[in-house]
A protein has these predicted regions:
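Extracytoplasmic gate region of multi-pass secondary transporters
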Residues: 29, 209-251
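Helix-breaking motifs and short loop linkers at transmembrane-helix boundaries and internal kinks
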Residues: 40, 72, 93-99, 240, ...
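Helix-to-loop junctions at the C-terminal end of transmembrane segments
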Residues: 60-72, 260-272, 358
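Paired small-residue
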Residues: 98-106, 298-306
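Cytoplasmic helix-loop-helix junction between adjacent transmembrane helices
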Residues: 103-141
Length: 402
């Protein structure tokens, strides 16, 4: 278990994942039906606003490592939190589609930066023997964001839609202040020096095992989209269950997302990172497919809870597997590559699925696609060598230019 000395690192990592994904992305999911119901945007426009965040996230993940090496960590993270807060506050009133698209894109960009840099800063500041326990807490921020949005947004919507946007902006500011508290107490100067010194060295080749994990993580991003972007609107409008019933499912998703990292940490210790990661892909593939068979209360609740568990659980399992394969010295760069793989596939699938919905007028085929892709990722991970830390290919990471 983490000790009190780990609280600053947990604060930094958890608030980073809370703002980056839990708020900047997942909080839009329960807002989506309301944006359509209240006539702010047509359904086809509203789903593209969700995809705008995914596109920004891709750019943020691409820039994260380079920016973190050139700029002060505290300032970079602080600006990212401010950008996410502004993206909510400045969208609190109806405006042009281009205005909303721009700020959803900016929130994604800031989220990509936070998701790569925040956990890396937190985990590299922790001794190896406690790193796994801290990682389990760091990624609970994703679920916290889903729970906050599921709990608060239905109540706020009874006031008006603008109130929901403003409160999400306030939560982003609070998260940023907590992260700054943690950063001021971490040995940032020492951590930054270590990262920069390592960046100046030749970067090792990626092993075959690492490449397969990175590719599988990209496939996870495609399976990630149906529930995290379209699930609430699917239940609310397409299946006519109403806002309250759909919000309850989003709450279950959030509860699962908080359980996920802790469950993943247990699996990793019990069965090893390699086997646990493949098992996680299989479970998520099955849970995504549940709506294809039934959306009765029991089955839709099972789908919400299990997918929530595996959304954050797979992030934790992938992070643990990468750390196992490459070690702490190369973790930040390889995790950055994994984030780029994830965000690239996520952005492409977000736009592709939005376009497919526009053509078909139904979300149901998207769940079939997500499930099949996750099953493919499971097969890919089963091909992964058991334990390979020595590079097996000549494919290398880009060297840092001094």
């Amino acid at each position: 278990m983490p000790s009190r000395r780990d609280l600053p690192a947990i604060a930094v990592g958890t608030t980073a994942t809370l703002a980056a994904v839990g708020l900047a992305r997942l909080a839009y999911t329960p807002l989506l039906p309301a944006v359509i119901h209240q006539g702010w945007f047509h359904s086809s426009q509203a789903v593209y606003l969700g995809a705008a965040n995914l596109l920004g996230y891709l750019l943020g993940a691409l820039l994260a490592v380079r920016l973190s090496e050139r700029f002060d960590t505290r300032k970079l993270l602080g600006l990212s939190f401010v950008a996410i807060a502004l993206s909510f506050v400045l969208c609190a009133l109806p405006a042009a589609f281009s205005w909303f698209f721009t700020w959803r894109f900016i929130s994604g960009l800031a989220g990509g930066l936070l998701m790569v840099v925040g956990p890396s800063v937190a985990l590299t500041a922790i001794p190896p023997e406690r790193r796994g326990a801290v990682a389990s807490f760091v990624f609970t921020g994703i679920g916290m964001g889903a729970i906050l949005s599921a709990s608060l947004i239905p109540m706020l919507l009874r006031l008006n839609l603008s109130a929901a946007w403003l409160v999400l902006g306030l939560l982003s500011i609070v998260a940023g202040l907590l992260a700054d508290w943690g950063l001021r107490r971490l040995a940032i100067n020492h951590a930054s020096t270590a990262v920069k010194a390592d960046a100046a060295l030749p970067v090792p080749a990626l092993s075959l095992a690492t490449l397969l994990v990175v590719l599988a993580y990209g496939l996870d991003a495609i399976g990630f989209v149906p529930h995290t972007v379209f699930w609430v609107d699917f239940l609310d409008r397409e299946k006519a269950l109403g806002t309250d019933a759909a919000s309850m499912q989003w709450l279950l998703f959030g509860i699962g997302a908080i359980i996920g990292p802790l469950f993943a940490g247990y699996l990793g210790k019990r069965f090893g990172w390699r086997r646990s990661l493949a098992l996680g892909f299989f479970i998520k593939a099955a849970a995504i497919a549940i709506p294809l068979l039934s959306i009765t209360l029991f089955w839709r609740s099972a789908s919400s809870l299990i997918v929530g568990i595996m959304v954050t659980g797979l992030v934790t399992l992938t992070s643990g597997r990468v750390m196992e394969l490459v070690g702490p010295a190369s973790y930040k760069r390889v995790w950055g590559i994994g984030a780029v793989s994830f965000s690239s596939a996520q952005a492409l699938s977000g736009y592709g699925m939005s376009a497919l919905y526009g053509i078909l007028g139904s979300y149901l085929p998207l769940f079939a696609i997500g499930s099949l892709v996750m099953a493919s990722g499971c097969l890919l991970l089963m091909l992964t060598p058991r334990a390979q830390t020595v590079p097996a290919t000549s494919i290398k990471l880009c060297k840092n230019e001094s």
